[in-house]
């Protein structure tokens, strides 16, 4: 979920996914999950492209999450993507995003953002894929999640110290983040829910075009 200076939940999108709000479709050999959720505010035009491609144009939105990835996440997955367009005007993340259960954890690996860079309780750093990421944790109480509207869960964050350049192929070696989190006592759950490379935004405008494999 988003953690901005103002109290709102951009992750509400993912949190509210509960079955009816998200759709999964077989879209490529390497990706099988298409996520498209909006709270109804503003205009969000999302396109489920061929293969692992998706695009989204948004204007004066509330909260939305659009992305492609996998129905079942993995701690061992290497995510490749190309953000040919990444142009947020306001709050937004370009991020690997997903959930685990047992325990219930919401996690982010944020490669770029708009006007706000997320933070939390600082735990350390991890070097991966040509960049250094700050590690944070946050906790949500009585908040929406994949398990209901009023749950308590922890969020794990790896946030790149500087925005990652876009427009060329990029890699997120997720295992590096998982191992770094473990070293700080941040253990993910044993039951993996979806895992997507997402465009997430709140009260903003912009456009993105991302291919995931």
From Swiss-Prot:
Alphabetical keyword list: Carbohydrate metabolism, Glycosidase, Hydrolase, Polysaccharide degradation, Signal, Xylan degradation
Pfam families: Glyco_hydro_11
Transmembrane segments: none
Keyword Transmembrane: no
Gene Ontology MF terms: endo-1,4-beta-xylanase activity
InterPro entries assigned to the protein according to its UniProt record, in alphabetical order: ConA-like_dom_sf (IPR013320), GH11/12 (IPR013319), GH11_AS_1 (IPR018208), GH11_AS_2 (IPR033119), GH11_dom (IPR033123), Glyco_hydro_11 (IPR001137)
Segment forming the signal sequence: 1-28
Pathway: Glycan degradation; xylan degradation
GO biological process, one term: xylan catabolic process
All residue ranges annotated as the GH11 domain in the record: 29-213
Active-site residues annotated for this sequence: 106, 200
Known EC number: 3.2.1.8
EC supergroup of this enzyme: hydrolase
Catalyzed reaction equations: Endohydrolysis of (1->4)-beta-D-xylosidic linkages in xylans
Sequence similarity: Belongs to the glycosyl hydrolase 11 (cellulase G) family.
Protein name (Swiss-Prot/TrEMBL): Endo-1,4-beta-xylanase
Taxon lineage: Bacteria, Bacillati, Bacillota, Bacilli, Bacillales
Gene this chain is encoded by: xlnA
